[in-house]
Amino acid sequence: DNWTAFLYFQKGMTLLYGGQERSCVHLPSLFDKDSVDWTSGPDRGEELRRLSRMKKHPLLADGAYHVRALAGDILQAVHWAGGRQLTGVFSVRGTQAPVAVDAPDGRYPNLAGEGEIEVKFGRVRCQGDPIVFEAARMAR
Protein backbone atom coordinates (compact mmCIF):
# COMPACT_ATOMS: atom_id res chain seq x y z
CA ASP A 1 0.00 0.00 0.00
CA ASN A 2 1.57 3.24 -1.19
CA TRP A 3 0.11 5.52 1.47
CA THR A 4 1.38 3.28 4.26
CA ALA A 5 4.86 3.09 2.71
CA PHE A 6 4.84 6.89 2.26
CA LEU A 7 3.93 7.34 5.96
CA TYR A 8 6.90 5.18 6.96
CA PHE A 9 9.15 7.20 4.61
CA GLN A 10 8.32 10.49 6.37
CA LYS A 11 10.48 11.94 9.12
CA GLY A 12 9.17 11.34 12.62
CA MET A 13 6.99 8.68 14.16
CA THR A 14 4.69 6.59 11.97
CA LEU A 15 1.10 6.38 13.20
CA LEU A 16 -1.21 3.55 12.12
CA TYR A 17 -4.94 3.18 12.70
CA GLY A 18 -5.91 0.34 15.01
CA GLY A 19 -6.51 -2.66 12.78
CA GLN A 20 -4.54 -1.36 9.81
CA GLU A 21 -2.14 -4.28 10.26
CA ARG A 22 -5.10 -6.58 9.42
CA SER A 23 -6.40 -4.45 6.52
CA CYS A 24 -9.37 -3.18 8.55
CA VAL A 25 -11.39 -0.70 6.50
CA HIS A 26 -13.48 0.44 9.47
CA LEU A 27 -12.17 3.73 10.86
CA PRO A 28 -12.25 3.48 14.64
CA SER A 29 -13.81 6.15 16.81
CA LEU A 30 -11.29 8.34 18.57
CA PHE A 31 -13.47 8.98 21.62
CA ASP A 32 -15.49 5.80 22.18
CA LYS A 33 -14.57 2.17 22.72
CA ASP A 34 -14.37 0.64 19.27
CA SER A 35 -13.03 -2.92 19.06
CA VAL A 36 -10.88 -4.03 16.14
CA ASP A 37 -12.09 -6.94 14.00
CA TRP A 38 -8.84 -8.93 13.78
CA THR A 39 -10.36 -11.26 11.14
CA SER A 40 -11.37 -8.50 8.71
CA GLY A 41 -8.64 -8.93 6.13
CA PRO A 42 -5.22 -10.24 5.21
CA ASP A 43 -2.38 -9.93 7.71
CA ARG A 44 -0.01 -7.13 6.65
CA GLY A 45 2.49 -7.92 9.41
CA GLU A 46 5.38 -8.85 7.10
CA GLU A 47 4.90 -5.69 5.01
CA LEU A 48 4.87 -3.53 8.16
CA ARG A 49 7.97 -5.27 9.54
CA ARG A 50 9.81 -4.59 6.25
CA LEU A 51 8.73 -0.93 6.37
CA SER A 52 9.77 -0.73 10.03
CA ARG A 53 13.27 -1.94 9.08
CA MET A 54 13.37 0.71 6.33
CA LYS A 55 12.25 3.37 8.85
CA LYS A 56 15.42 2.73 10.89
CA HIS A 57 17.67 3.70 7.96
CA PRO A 58 20.08 6.46 9.11
CA LEU A 59 19.20 8.73 6.17
CA LEU A 60 15.58 8.93 7.39
CA ALA A 61 16.76 10.34 10.71
CA ASP A 62 19.76 12.44 9.76
CA GLY A 63 19.37 13.41 6.11
CA ALA A 64 17.82 16.40 4.39
CA TYR A 65 14.40 15.70 2.88
CA HIS A 66 12.40 16.81 -0.15
CA VAL A 67 9.03 15.59 -1.46
CA ARG A 68 7.14 16.58 -4.59
CA ALA A 69 3.92 15.61 -6.32
CA LEU A 70 4.21 14.35 -9.90
CA ALA A 71 1.57 13.88 -12.57
CA GLY A 72 -0.62 10.81 -12.19
CA ASP A 73 -0.92 11.06 -8.39
CA ILE A 74 2.66 9.91 -7.83
CA LEU A 75 4.73 11.24 -4.92
CA GLN A 76 8.51 11.30 -5.18
CA ALA A 77 10.58 11.86 -2.04
CA VAL A 78 14.30 11.85 -1.33
CA HIS A 79 16.31 11.77 1.91
CA TRP A 80 20.01 12.54 1.48
CA ALA A 81 23.22 13.17 3.39
CA GLY A 82 26.79 13.17 2.18
CA GLY A 83 27.14 11.07 -0.94
CA ARG A 84 24.11 8.79 -0.32
CA GLN A 85 20.38 9.14 -0.89
CA LEU A 86 17.21 7.19 -0.26
CA THR A 87 14.65 7.69 -3.05
CA GLY A 88 10.96 6.83 -2.72
CA VAL A 89 8.28 6.69 -5.42
CA PHE A 90 4.70 6.25 -4.21
CA SER A 91 1.80 5.89 -6.65
CA VAL A 92 -1.10 6.82 -4.38
CA ARG A 93 -3.74 5.73 -6.93
CA GLY A 94 -1.82 2.78 -8.40
CA THR A 95 -0.82 4.71 -11.52
CA GLN A 96 1.89 3.15 -13.69
CA ALA A 97 4.42 5.52 -15.25
CA PRO A 98 8.13 6.07 -15.83
CA VAL A 99 9.59 8.40 -13.17
CA ALA A 100 12.83 10.38 -13.55
CA VAL A 101 15.22 9.93 -10.60
CA ASP A 102 18.61 11.43 -9.74
CA ALA A 103 20.39 8.10 -9.27
CA PRO A 104 23.05 6.21 -11.21
CA ASP A 105 21.78 3.56 -13.60
CA GLY A 106 21.80 0.11 -12.01
CA ARG A 107 19.78 -2.40 -10.00
CA TYR A 108 18.89 -1.76 -6.36
CA PRO A 109 16.95 -3.73 -3.72
CA ASN A 110 13.44 -2.36 -3.15
CA LEU A 111 13.43 -1.53 0.57
CA ALA A 112 9.63 -1.02 0.52
CA GLY A 113 8.77 -4.26 -1.23
CA GLU A 114 10.17 -7.34 -2.82
CA GLY A 115 12.62 -7.65 -5.66
CA GLU A 116 14.84 -5.07 -7.27
CA ILE A 117 14.42 -1.66 -8.83
CA GLU A 118 16.16 -0.88 -12.10
CA VAL A 119 17.27 2.64 -12.87
CA LYS A 120 17.80 2.91 -16.61
CA PHE A 121 18.58 6.16 -18.42
CA GLY A 122 17.78 8.02 -15.18
CA ARG A 123 14.27 6.55 -14.86
CA VAL A 124 12.47 3.89 -12.84
CA ARG A 125 9.30 2.18 -13.95
CA CYS A 126 6.56 2.75 -11.39
CA GLN A 127 4.25 -0.28 -11.58
CA GLY A 128 1.80 1.09 -8.99
CA ASP A 129 3.59 -0.39 -5.95
CA PRO A 130 5.85 1.58 -3.58
CA ILE A 131 9.52 1.89 -4.51
CA VAL A 132 12.31 2.81 -2.08
CA PHE A 133 15.99 2.35 -2.88
CA GLU A 134 19.37 3.60 -1.70
CA ALA A 135 21.91 4.89 -4.21
CA ALA A 136 24.84 7.24 -4.57
CA ARG A 137 23.82 10.89 -4.71
CA MET A 138 24.34 12.38 -8.16
CA ALA A 139 26.37 15.61 -8.43
CA ARG A 140 24.25 18.53 -9.58
Regions flagged by a language model, labelled:
Residues 7, 19, 51, 87, ...:
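Conserved, mostly hydrophobic/aromatic
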Residues 27-30, 34-72:
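Aromatic- and carboxylate-lined catalytic core of secreted/periplasmic carbohydrate-active enzymes
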Residues 68-104:
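Carbohydrate-binding surface patches
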Residues 118-140:
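C-terminal beta-strand-rich structural cap/linker in extracellular carbohydrate-active enzymes
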Residues 14, 21-25, 73, 92-95, ...:
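Short, solvent-exposed loop/turn segments at secondary-structure junctions
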Residues 1-8, 49-52, 75:
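Generic hydrophobic alpha-helical scaffold/packing signal
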Residues 102-114:
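Solvent-exposed beta-hairpin/edge-strand motifs
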Residues 1-42:
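Aromatic/acidic polysaccharide-binding cleft in carbohydrate-active enzymes
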